[in-house]
């Protein structure tokens, strides 16, 4: 082998360094003293721009050193050296010119003595040995580099480093990181290509990069920043999904202040580059589509694809260094094959098609060729190549990452009516709302109603009714006018005639469910023809009156929840007459006042809540008003209409109706309203007494309503009593007052013997509440428990009710069907936790029974505990 391809290491200037695998040398440092090989064949080392990277070496020819050729400068070498220029003269000395020139090595003289030829042969043999040793060292270094893990700053966006990475030293445009021992030469070459392309692009654009961006005196790795952003789908996707904090943390800047600076630097330095690359990608796709259409007719013959010219645009950089090139081509070009299977390429591959990943390992640049329409460089192919376009199924979510759960809740959130809040209203003019209510214009009234509904519906804010009392007057006027319009077409009926026809709450609820199930939309053409008649105009007025009346009482209901507003409503002289008038209208025309069963049910509930909140301030003026109020309250009783034709029967039902809070939610407010009316004034009691004297059937219906909430005696009754404590207090208070209205012994006996025995069941419940250890602890541990029994008032009212019923039964000489056994009474008397006052009351009850033997004879096995 001759010496044509070798040049001694001493002939090269020391100002230029050629780092090996795993090493990096600056331009002014000392380089290793081994001979350099300039060759383009595989198995050698090519010297390019500041480093000597190992090319793709064939494993079958590791020692193929004889087929080397002299070094030829690549055109990409001049392109990749924007700020440096070298000139090697023929003798290897520094020339200092402004261009890059590599002259051929010196040829030996043709006339060499025999001694010199011998020395040259020995020197050539030594050089071959050194070259083989160098090749082995480089292979070992290459394997060591491949076994290393990728640095943390090269992972994807979704990866979070467990330990915060220390910012690297300031990189230059030629080195991506200050610590070169952690980066492969392929990464350094990729960084160089990226920075050269970026600087060239910004200079051509007219916005040159004058300074390198830094955050907290730490330079930003622009290539890594660009790769992370493009891997996430581009800057738009990063901003849309708020990936900037993750990208900043991946680059070593986790502070919140660095995020805004990072976004600013990206928009200034890399955003134009990204837009140009995307535009080039679109142009490339259109060209490929045109080629595919052109080659559709000649797919049986091999195609000759012209070679792309080398450019400095972002398109050329990504086409040469991208790792996600066309993966569907059967015979890729040699350049792409080298990039894809190079061992020095990064190991992280982006899964997104449109996001450019990290630049791959550097490859041997090819000389530029001019592409013409008449001539093209042929590609050797053993089989015909058919264009296969990249296919992707259509995303029904348009790119949004929606899973099944999010899609399921998406329809529910869209279909649900979003009510505005007080914040959405801004400044509200109450005087303008009052004028709108008094204008008699339907649109103005509707707008004012909607605003007032929003203002009064907020539970965190109380509408100050005392500061704007004109609103109450305006609402009363609107409700009065609407009620007049609805009653103008309805006949008047007698109260006693409609008492048996008055539907209960359960019947109204059933009618509402039937109406909803049978709902059907009317024909549009028929609606247009009906709107031309006079009756249709009246129907529209009636519909508007119904909606306005419902809105007014919803507003009154919301206002009545606050005590300050209750006083303002009661002090208005027109409010109570309006309420009584609506109650009478619902009693007379329960099913015909409003056309819709749902509106009828809503109006019943709103009027009951208003009456429940304000009844402690009402004084019933006469018996007629008291009768209407009582009939309206009794309509919410849990009494089962299937077992009786009318609500006022001659005989009581066989059992007390069962109360369930889920199915009878408005029985409690009805009892509360009746209790407040009884406790307000003696005049109310007098009016109720007159009603019960004239018609005892009302008294039986009221007893069924009050007795339904008293739980039956069983093992769960104590827990039920704890949950219903406020309702039980009101119910027992009303029972004690209602029993005082009873004057007939037969009626009292019927109440005591109804079902399995209401008298016995109540007495057992009172015994349980009085003697339970958790409610009345022993005296030695009394300090650990509350001193007052929470059921004390219930027990007192219950004993008063039992005493009154027992006295009425004794007056009529009527025997009870059941009575507690003597063993039960003895157990209560001997219990250490039984309350003393309750024992005295029990003793008095037993003494009043007269003959104890008679009481024992009335006991049976059914009533035993």
Swiss-Prot record:
Residues 1-34, 54-92, 116-143, 163-183, 288-380 are annotated as: Disordered. Keywords: Activator, Chromatin regulator, DNA-binding, Nucleus, Phosphoprotein, Transcription, Transcription regulation. CDD domains: ARID_Swi1p-like. Signal peptide: none annotated. It is found in: Nucleus. Residues 17-30, 328-353 have a biased composition (Polar residues). Pfam families: ARID (PF01388). InterPro entries: ARID/SWI1_ChromRemod, ARID_dom, ARID_dom_sf, ARM-type_fold. The keyword Nucleus applies. Residues 188-278 form the ARID domain. GO terms for biological process: chromatin remodeling; positive regulation of transcription by RNA polymerase II; regulation of transcription by RNA polymerase II; transcription initiation-coupled chromatin remodeling. GO terms for molecular function: transcription cis-regulatory region binding. The modification Phosphoserine is found at residues 852, 855. Its main location: nucleus. Residues 121-139 have a biased composition (Low complexity). It comes from the Eukaryota. Residues 356-368 have a biased composition (Pro residues). Component of the SWI/SNF complex, an ATP-dependent chromatin remodeling complex, required for the positive and negative regulation of gene expression of a large number of genes. It changes chromatin structure by altering DNA-histone contacts within a nucleosome, leading eventually to a change in nucleosome position, thus facilitating or repressing binding of gene-specific transcription factors. Component of the SWI/SNF global transcription activator complex composed of at least arp9, arp42, snf5, snf22, snf30, sbf59, sol1, ssr1, ssr2, ssr3, ssr4 and tfg3. Belongs to the SWI1 family. This is SWI/SNF chromatin-remodeling complex subunit sol1. It comes from Schizosaccharomyces pombe (strain 972 / ATCC 24843).
């Amino acid at each position: 082998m001759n010496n044509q391809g070798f040049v001694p290491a001493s002939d090269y200037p020391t100002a230029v360094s050629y780092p090996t695998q795993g090493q990096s040398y600056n331009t002014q440092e000392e380089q290793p003293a081994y001979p350099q090989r300039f060759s383009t064949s595989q198995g050698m080392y090519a010297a390019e721009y500041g480093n000597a990277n190992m090319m793709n070496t064939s494993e079958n020819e590791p020692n193929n050193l004889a087929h080397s050729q002299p070094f030829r400068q690549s055109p990409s070498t001049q392109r990749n050296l924007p700020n440096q220029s070298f000139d090697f003269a023929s003798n290897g000395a520094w020339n200092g010119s402004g261009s890059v020139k590599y002259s051929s090595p010196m040829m030996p003289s043709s006339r060499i003595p025999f001694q010199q030829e011998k020395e040259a042969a020995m020197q050539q043999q030594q050089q071959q040995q050194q070259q083989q040793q160098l090749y082995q060292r480089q292979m070992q270094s290459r394997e060591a580099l491949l076994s290393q893990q990728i640095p943390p700053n090269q992972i994807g966006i979704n990866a979070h480093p467990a330990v915060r990475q220390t910012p690297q030293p300031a990189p230059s445009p030629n080195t991506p990181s200050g610590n070169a021992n952690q980066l492969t030469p392929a990464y350094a070459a990729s960084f160089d290509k990226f920075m050269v392309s970026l600087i060239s692009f910004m200079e051509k654009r007219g916005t040159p990069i004058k300074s390198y961006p830094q955050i907290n005196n730490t330079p930003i790795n622009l290539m890594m920043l660009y790769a992370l952003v493009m891997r996430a789908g581009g800057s738009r996707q990063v901003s849309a999904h708020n990936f900037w904090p993750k990208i900043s943390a991946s680059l070593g800047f986790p502070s919140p202040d660095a995020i805004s600076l990072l976004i600013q630097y990206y928009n200034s330095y890399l955003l134009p580059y990204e837009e140009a690359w995307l535009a080039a990608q679109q142009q490339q796709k259109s060209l490929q589509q045109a080629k595919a259409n052109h080659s559709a007719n000649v797919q049986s013959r091999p195609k000759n694809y012209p070679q792309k010219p080398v450019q400095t645009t972002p398109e050329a950089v990504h086409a040469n260094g991208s790792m996600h090139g066309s993966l569907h081509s059967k015979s890729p070009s040699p350049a792409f094959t080298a990039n894809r299977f190079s061992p020095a390429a990064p190991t992280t591959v982006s899964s997104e098609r449109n996001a450019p990943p990290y630049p791959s390992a550097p490859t041997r640049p090819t000389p530029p060729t001019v592409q013409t329409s008449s001539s093209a460089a042929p590609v050797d192919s053993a089989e015909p190549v058919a264009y296969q376009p990249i296919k992707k199924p259509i995303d029904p979510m348009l790119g949004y990452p929606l899973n099944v759960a999010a899609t399921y809740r998406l329809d529910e959130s869209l279909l649900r009516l979003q009510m505005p809040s007080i914040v959405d209203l801004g400044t509200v003019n109450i005087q303008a709302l009052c004028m709108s209510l008094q204008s008699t214009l339907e649109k103005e009234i509707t707008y004012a109603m909607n605003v007032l509904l929003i203002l009064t519906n907020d539970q965190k804010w109380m509408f100050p009714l005392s500061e704007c009392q004109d609103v109450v007057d305006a609402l009363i006027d609107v409700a009065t006018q609407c009620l007049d319009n609805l009653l103008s077409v309805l006949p008047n009926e007698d109260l006693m005639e409609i008492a048996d026809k008055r539907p209960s709450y359960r019947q109204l609820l059933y009618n509402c469910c039937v109406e909803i199930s049978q709902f059907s939309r009317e024909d549009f053409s028929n609606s247009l023809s009906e709107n031309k008649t006079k009756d249709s105009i009246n129907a529209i007025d009636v519909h508007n009156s119904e909606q306005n009346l419902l809105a007014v009482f919803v507003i009154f209901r919301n206002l009545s929840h606050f005590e300050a507003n209750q006083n303002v409503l009661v002090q208005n002289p027109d409010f109570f007459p309006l309420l009584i008038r609506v109650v009478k209208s619902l009693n007379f025309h329960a099913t015909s006042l409003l056309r819709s069963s749902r509106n009828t049910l809503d109006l019943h509930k709103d009027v009951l809540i208003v009456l429940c909140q304000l009844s402690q301030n009402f004084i019933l003026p006469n018996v007629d008003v008291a009768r209407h109020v009582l009939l309206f309250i009794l309509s919410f009783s849990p009494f089962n209409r299937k077992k009786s034709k009318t609500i006022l029967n001659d005989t009581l039902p066989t059992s007390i109706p069962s109360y369930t809070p889920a199915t009878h939610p408005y029985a409690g407010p009805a009892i509360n309203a009746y209790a407040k009316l009884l406790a307000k004034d003696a005049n109310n009691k007098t009016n109720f007494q007159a009603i019960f004297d004239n018609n005892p059937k009302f008294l039986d219906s009221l007893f069924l309503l009050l007795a339904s909430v008293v739980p039956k005696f069983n093992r769960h009754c104590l827990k039920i009593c704890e949950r219903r404590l406020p309702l039980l207090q009101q119910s027992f208070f009303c029972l004690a007052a209602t029993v005082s209205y009873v004057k007939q012994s037969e009626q009292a006996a019927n109440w005591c013997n109804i079902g399995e025995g209401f008298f016995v069941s109540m007495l057992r419940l009172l015994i349980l509440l009085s003697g339970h250890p958790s409610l009345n602890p022993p005296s030695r541990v009394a300090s650990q428990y509350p001193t007052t029994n929470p059921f004390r008032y219930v027990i007192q009212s219950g004993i008063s009710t039992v005493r009154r019923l027992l006295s009425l039964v004794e007056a009529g000489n009527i025997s009870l069907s059941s009575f507690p056994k003597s063993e039960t009474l003895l157990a209560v008397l001997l219990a250490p936790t039984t309350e003393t006052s309750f024992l005295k009351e029990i003793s008095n009850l037993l003494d009043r029974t007269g003959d104890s033997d008679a009481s024992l004879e009335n006991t049976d096995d059914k009533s035993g505990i």
